[in-house]
Amino acid sequence: MNHIKVISLVQYSSSVKKLKEEFLRNFKRFDSVEDFSDHHYVSKGKASKQHSKNWVKKVQDEWKILNQNLPETIFVRACESRMDLLRAVIIGAEGTPYHDGLFFFDIQFPDTYPSVPPNVYYHSGGLRINPNLYNCGKVCLSLLGTWHGNARQSWLPKESTMLQVLVSIQALVLNEQPYFNEPGYGLIKGTWLGESKSKVYSENVFLLSLKTMVYSMRKPPQHFEEYVQNHYFVRSHDIVKACNAYKAGAPLGSMVKGGVQDLEQARQSGSKKFKTDVASFMQTVVDEFVKLGVKELAEKPKPPVNNANTENQSKKKTRKRSRSSR
């Protein structure tokens, strides 16, 4: 009966998953909302504030660029009553320690924009998942003026855009080897020492990424509540498969849609500590998936009963009883 129950749960989950996949397909990459009461920068301005015509035009141009050019893995919401506010979510890319995760950013266009870059805050949940993303929410990026770089990497008022900022965070910050984002560490990239340290750092980052998933599911940012729920429902099995593979020794980043990405990379192995840490935290993630409705993950099917073995055991018990009665 338990085995049949699990099959029915899987079938039900499969039909629900199709509906949620449709929701995700139809979720607009760019859209506007009425308010942002939980926005990090909401207290830094007022809805009634009058901005210059040039400022309004520039922000509207930014909206247009985002609406037409956002990649499939970045979603943005603008605020109708507060044109200075945006919220963005970036999906972690395959092959990185951020794979399948959602990473949220609150953005504000200052009064002097675009003479100065936008303000960007990362929803960290108190976790430091990258040298450029502080647990206080600070985002270090040359383009934002929060990190030093050459002139071409800095904010250029007549050229730089909000789209460029978001794509830079995705490509340059949430990358395959975030360890080397730390200043000076790039000098040892490619060496045994550098790659060893990078591996340990990335393994820890993946664990923090799992914790970020839990944080987002428990406290999804406003206007992305349904998106968070549907995203993790749809990706739950891939995330669990990846965790099981990492527990078994697969190297971090080798899993793509539940399969091994690179045979040469797969010959390597995750560290013993990584396997243990993933195993110890995995159940917390699974519990959150179950709360979302992925019920079959809560069921542990028992192996089917072997009738022949059952009959033999029954005969043995009968013989024992007959002997004891003599």
Curated annotation (Swiss-Prot):
The active site is at 140 (glycyl thioester intermediate). Residues 297-326 are annotated as: Disordered. Residues 54-214 form the UBC core domain. GO terms for biological process: protein ubiquitination. Pfam families: UQ_con. Its EC number is 2.3.2.23. Pathway: Protein modification; protein ubiquitination. GO terms for molecular function: ATP binding; ubiquitin conjugating enzyme activity. Accepts the ubiquitin from the E1 complex and catalyzes its covalent attachment to other proteins. This is Putative ubiquitin-conjugating enzyme E2 38. It comes from Arabidopsis thaliana.
